[in-house]
Amino acid sequence: MKFVDEAYIDVSAGDGGAGCVSFRHEKYKEFGGPNGGDGGRGGHVFAVADPNLNTLVDFRFSRRHDAKRGEHGMGSDMFGAAGDDITLKMPVGTIISDAETGEVLFELLTPGEVITIAKGGDGGFGNLRFKSAINRAPRQKTPGWPGEKRNLKLELKVLADVGLLGMPNAGKSTLISAISNARPRIADYPFTTLHPNLGVVRVGPEQSFVVADLPGLIEGASEGAGLGHLFLRHLQRTRLLLHVVDMAPFDEGVDTVAQAKAIVNELKKYDPALYNKPRWLVLNKLDMVPLEHREALVKDFVKRFKFKGPVFQISALTREGCESLIKIIYQHVKAQQKAEQTPEAVDQRFAPDTE
């Protein structure tokens, strides 16, 4: 499956209905006066943030989205009915921008959030509106106003607390399936993951965080090599990066330290801010390393890699070390969330007396 994190759509709100020219026709009243109603407004186009979606793939197959126009006004003071609105479901985190100018118009960040992306036109006035002391029998009316039409670009940045990065076949998909509800495709060959996978990790009652598994990076990813560069942008909103390293590669001639350094260099080239994010080292597949050699292997790797941050030894396959890892991650994420919250202003009338 090809992950679509970018899509273009054309939306058209409904035009307003035209006003009506009409006069009352009653027995014994030759000049009954105007009674033409207004036209109905055109339908709006809404976008709603749906937490159950995590791709924009549906919009690749349905580009045009048109709301209904309003009905025309009629005689007997009858106003036209409003056109039916349409609501487009989009993943949480969708950025909506003008496809021609690139200007960001909206951003869906909260589940259930609803925004109006194209407003329907107002209905036209019927001749009832033009009645005055001077003009008792107006024959004026106005057409409905046109609805908004927009060519939009949709872009999705995955909203995850934790991002997994590493070389292809490092065991990232096995890790996310071991600690979360995600069930990505897993196989014993590189580039199994072709699109981002999101998983919710439940640490305890009302304690959880979201983790994103992205396609593996290779050297030259920041210049467009491989698949990973297409999804590096998804890591920009994460609070923590887990650098997963395969400590038991099939090819014994592979230099795991050189591969790990290549990943870090790609981050630095792509975005210095991404490089400076909190990054932890997760040494995976240690179940395949003999116990008597494990400590020396880990110590040698960390020394050659010159890594100063937290280091975790796990086996995603047997889940060894995973439980303690997710608890520490949750504590870090909660601390980050608390630090990001802006303190509420305190009304000085109710502020505690510090004297």
Swiss-Prot record:
GO terms for molecular function: GTP binding; GTPase activity; magnesium ion binding. Residues 160-334 form the OBG-type G domain. The keyword Cytoplasm applies. Mg(2+) binds at S173, T193. It is found in: Cytoplasm. GO terms for cellular component: cytoplasm. PROSITE patterns: G_OBG (PS51710), GTP1_OBG (PS00905), OBG (PS51883). Its EC number is 3.6.5.-. InterPro entries: G_OBG, GTP-bd, GTP-bd_Obg/CgtA, GTP1-OBG_CS, GTP1_OBG_dom, GTP1_OBG_dom_sf, OBG_GTPase, P-loop_NTPase. GTP binds at residues 166-173, 191-195, 213-216, 284-287, 315-317. It comes from the Bacteria. Keywords: Cytoplasm, GTP-binding, Hydrolase, Magnesium, Metal-binding, Nucleotide-binding. GO terms for biological process: ribosome biogenesis. Its main location: cytoplasm. The keyword Nuclease does not apply. Its cofactor is Mg(2+). Pfam families: GTP1_OBG (PF01018), MMR_HSR1 (PF01926). Residues 1-159 form the Obg domain. Belongs to the TRAFAC class OBG-HflX-like GTPase superfamily. OBG GTPase family. Monomer. An essential GTPase which binds GTP, GDP and possibly (p)ppGpp with moderate affinity, with high nucleotide exchange rates and a fairly low GTP hydrolysis rate. Plays a role in control of the cell cycle, stress response, ribosome biogenesis and in those bacteria that undergo differentiation, in morphogenesis control. This is GTPase Obg. The lineage of its organism: Bacteria, Pseudomonadati, Pseudomonadota, Betaproteobacteria, Burkholderiales. The gene is obg.
